[in-house]
Amino acid sequence: LTGQKGESFTNAAMQHGTDTEPLARAAYEALQDVLVDEVGFVPHPSIIMAGASPDGLVGDDGLLEIKCPNTATHIETLLSQSVPGKYNTQMQFQMACTGRQWCDFVSFDNRLPDELQLFVKRVPRDNEFIKQMEDEVVKFLNELDIKIAQLMDLKNV
């Protein structure tokens, strides 16, 4: 609306994740004996103004979501042997945008001994969840369009 570029924010933890992601991708490729195709923004096939940025595409059916958290968070993931729930929506929407059938969640911490650095868990596509989420995204975008139209009307007064 303003035409101005928004401010960006980064901290040491975010920078660590950015710096470490290529190492995590390489470790995953070695473990799974695959090549990961890096992609940028992938628009949703039917919802205009929606899309996702997965960390990579794997084969014909998969994608990759990499997290390089702090050591305590990575250890919790190792101990639970499960994907933190807060990432499910992100991965499901990535599958909706890419048409992929599964997402390998990766947690990686190269500050730990080699055998503890990498955690991989496959998450299958959930079409029922995706449908509900897509309905909510469409609803949100429609509400946003209404608000923008109201602001434009005020601007033209």
Can you say where each PLM-predicted feature lies in the sequence?
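Accessory terminal regions of nucleic-acid processing enzymes
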Residues: L1-V157
